[in-house]
Amino acid sequence: MRVKGIMRNCQHLWIWGTMLFGMWMICSAVEQLWVTVYYGVPVWKEATTTLFCASDAKAYSTEAHNVWATHACVPTDPNPQEVILGNVTENFNMWKNNMVEQMHEDIISLWDQSLKPCVKLTPLCVTLNCIDKNITDWKNTTIIGGGEVKNCSFNITTSRRDKVHKEYALFYKLDVVPIKGDNNSSRYRLINCNTSVITQACPKVSFEPIPIHYCAPAGFAILKCNDKKFNGTGPCTNVSTVQCTHGIRPVVSTQLLLNGSLAEEEIVIRSENFTDNAKTIIVHLNESVEINCTRPYNNVRRSLSIGPGRAFRTREIIGIIRQAHCNISRAKWNNTLKQIVEKLREQFKNKTIVFNHSSGGDPEIVTHSFNCGGEFFYCNSTQLFNSTWNGTDIKGDNKNSTLITLPCRIKQIINMWQGVGKAMYAPPIQGQIRCSSNITGLLLTRDGGNSSSREEIFRPGGGNMRDNWRSELYKYKVVRIEPLGVAPTKAKRRVVQREKRAVGTIGAMFLGFLGAAGSTMGAGSLTLTVQARQLLSGIVQQQNNLLRAIDAQQHLLQLTVWGIKQLQARVLAVERYLRDQQLLGIWGCSGKLICTTTVPWNASWSNKSMNQIWDNLTWMEWEREIDNYTSIIYSLIEESQNQQGKNEQELLELDKWASLWNWFDITNWLWYIKIFIMIVGGLIGLRIVFTVLSIVNRVRQGYSPLSFQTHLPTPRGPDRPEGIEEEGGERDRDRSVRLVHGFLALIWDDLRSLCLFSYHRLRDLLLIVKRIVELLGRRGWEALKYWWNLLQYWSKELKNSAVGLLNAIAIAVAEGTDRVIEVVQRICRAIIHIPRRIRQGLERALL
């Protein structure tokens, strides 16, 4: 019977073991994913950063005092690389592009810096007595009317401030205005004296634009849209990455965009909002239109002393004169307008397009203003914008001449485009001036009014130089490269396994760099990561302070705007690299491109499978999906690495147990002897204490202490039957033993008693655990059998019910089918018997 019971128990244990093994296999089938760090992933985010310039200034001009100061730029890359980004769609917005704002600020700074050491013309803000200058034109005819040039005399301080003498100078009519309230029409003043500080451009300053390449520092990149019909806003599917832009000439002009880039296929018109007439329309031409400008007459510069160390440079006109003018091919211009009209009609629902002259404003806006050979031309563009287009037919241009000649006027006192309250005096240029430029774009404004009108009127615009820069930077944007990426993988870092300890590290994260100085070394070690990060932040802050100081004192350091940008770009690149390397070091991933961690992947971050992530998503798409959880993942990796560091430290402290040979070291033996003596002493002490307590207890019960030789009764074991001992004695369950003699015997008896006690208690505990396990197994097995029987019963009932239902349905269907067949048969018989019934009826009728 016992053998059968053992076999039944073994069967139960076998079944239980099989079930547990199956459950373990099912649970282990679920793959555990772990966070893996990748360095160098192709991920970027939109950013604003300090760009620096690259230019080949020597190839364009040897003049060291060019206003653009491009000699401070780095040389251009002879082999620029452009990487096409396949399967990438990126959004661009030319109207909200920080590159435009940065270029605008740079050009303003360059102009201000170039004019800063030049002479202020405040002493010339005096009363001028002016008369018209008699000029001979190319027909040898004296011209007095019109007064294009004024000969003005004035009192001026010489090299000695207490001495004044009379001088004269020639001014253009546009540069002087009559003094108000003065009836004498010959009294004038300089036009900007009451509103601006006039600075005379230095004699060696040149305004010839040199192509400037804007470059991104290390850690950043410039994305370029290569869609040939890109309108400046929205998604771009043909994207590439470059380190520098193409060469951009910072041409300061209004109405017409000069010497820029061309559209690759057809003309493109761009506007932030075509329905808003306050928004400028930028027209990007696909073919340039040449404009040739000339100032025919000859000038000779003369210098006037206007104070100690100051000189005012004026002119003398020698020889014949023609009015300054510009020539444009009429056929090319009309063909260009025709293509522009086609694009405008697409936007404005096939309305009649009308081009009209500027509606008024400052001379810079009303005319086409630009710099030609150092002189500032203001050309009347009415002939360019004076036509009506109904479809592709032009009205209003009936002239047969092949050239359009724009009359131009020259100003020497220029309203600075950088801001209000600034003006510049451009010294006269000697000799004849000729310049040839290419019109590559237009700036247009649209009249508002009745939207139901059949006409749309467009006028030349400009004045906001940001639109000039925007026409070249529309296809670029700056992004910050994020080389650190995290993704789930099946790989886990093999580390020293140890339970985490609940240490208050969260509070330590908010300590400052020196906040842990008064803490213990153990508590301070928890803030090492924080201290490293704070240290880098301090370095970055110190560099930023240095840059601000340099920027504020650049006039003393003789640094150009480009020099400041070079320094900023280099510092920024170092900061970016240090930040990434610091994070890799904190995570224990220094020098690794792929670094596994012990952080389990949380499905709440992304519940996509491995195949969906690695086979279907790009790094950019993956980064957008987990962007909200990146900081959490970073903090978990950091905590995991900190715990790993503590585990390794504790492991190293236990490293002396790695070799058993160390156990035989003399120092270890002395330690073993010390421990043995302490144990023996403790046992002896416990023996003495228990003996004293036993004696005291017996004395309290009324017994007197006996000799240690007295036999004491000891309880008989339950496995010993009652009986007579070998030497006789009473028939009870007790036996007497003598107390041991000697020190070693006493120790041995105590150790034996302790071991027996431990053995009995452990055996009892194991028996209890065994009974509990058997009881739970038996109850569990009975419960499983009950549920199995219940499942079989209900399965059988459901089966019988289903069979009965099917039988009933089959019987009902069969009976119904039989009845239908019977009815059909009767109908068919009746139809078949109709002729017979007719015949029988006829026979009866005949009888």
Curated annotation (Swiss-Prot):
A motif (Di-leucine internalization motif) lies at residues 846-847. GO terms for biological process: clathrin-dependent endocytosis of virus by host cell; fusion of virus membrane with host endosome membrane; fusion of virus membrane with host plasma membrane; positive regulation of plasma membrane raft polarization; positive regulation of receptor clustering; viral protein processing; virion attachment to host cell. The gene is env. Keywords: AIDS, Apoptosis, Clathrin-mediated endocytosis of virus by host, Cleavage on pair of basic residues, Coiled coil, Disulfide bond, Fusion of virus membrane with host endosomal membrane, Fusion of virus membrane with host membrane, Glycoprotein, Host cell membrane, Host endosome, Host membrane, Host-virus interaction, Lipoprotein, Membrane, Palmitate, Signal, Transmembrane, Transmembrane helix, Viral attachment to host cell, Viral envelope protein, Viral immunoevasion, Viral penetration into host cytoplasm, Virion, Virus endocytosis by host, Virus entry into host cell. Residues 697-847 are cytoplasmic. Residues 709-731 are annotated as: Disordered. GO terms for cellular component: host cell endosome membrane; host cell plasma membrane; membrane; viral envelope; virion membrane. Residues 565-583 are annotated as: Immunosuppression. Some of the most genetically diverse regions of the viral genome are present in Env. They are called variable regions 1 through 5 (V1 through V5). Coreceptor usage of gp120 is determined mainly by the primary structure of the third variable region (V3) in the outer domain of gp120. The sequence of V3 determines which coreceptor, CCR5 and/or CXCR4 (corresponding to R5/macrophage, X4/T cell and R5X4/T cell and macrophage tropism), is used to trigger the fusion potential of the Env complex, and hence which cells the virus can infect. Binding to CCR5 involves a region adjacent in addition to V3. Residues 152-193 are annotated as: V2. This is Envelope glycoprotein gp160. InterPro entries: Gp120_core_sf (IPR036377), Gp160 (IPR037527), GP41-like (IPR000328), HIV1_Gp120 (IPR000777).
